[in-house]
Swiss-Prot record:
Name recorded for this polypeptide: Ribonuclease P protein component 1
Gene: rnp1
Any GO MF annotation of the entry: RNA binding
InterPro entries in the cross-refs: RNase_P/MRP_Rpp29_sf, RNP1, Rof/RNase_P-like, Rpp29/RNP1
Function per UniProt: Part of ribonuclease P, a protein complex that generates mature tRNA molecules by cleaving their 5'-ends.
Keyword Nuclease applies: yes
Annotated family: Belongs to the eukaryotic/archaeal RNase P protein component 1 family.
Taxonomic source organism: Haloarcula marismortui (strain ATCC 43049 / DSM 3752 / JCM 8966 / VKM B-1809) (Halobacterium marismortui)
UniProt-listed Pfam families: RNase_P-MRP_p29 (PF01868)
SMART domains found in the cross-reference section: POP4
Major location category of this protein: cytoplasm
Assembly and binders: Consists of a catalytic RNA component and at least 4-5 protein subunits.
GO CC annotation terms, alphabetical: cytoplasm; ribonuclease P complex
Amino acid sequence: MPLTPETLPRHELVGLDCEVVAASNPDVIGISGTVVMETTQMLTLEGADRVWHVPKDSATFAFDLSTETVLVDGDRLVARPARRTENTGDSLWR
C-alpha cells in the first residue's frame, strides 16, 4: 500500500518528519523532528538538540510527506504500531 494522506494513519511512522500542531499540553506545541520510535501511547521525536516523548492521544500531528503536509489527530494513532498497520477493511484507524 503506497504512503498517501489517506493511508498515513495505517503506515509505519518511524522516519517521517513530524510537528505537534495542537495539544492539551501547550508546552509540546511546536515541537518538531523525525519520528524515531513509536509505542502504543507515545511518539518519540528527535529534534536538533533533544529527544521528545509526546503522548499521541492528546495531540494533533503534522506529518511531512514528499508532496504535502498531512494533519492527523493523535487519537487515530493510539494502538500498538504492529496492530495499527495491519488492520484492513473498516478499520477504526483508517
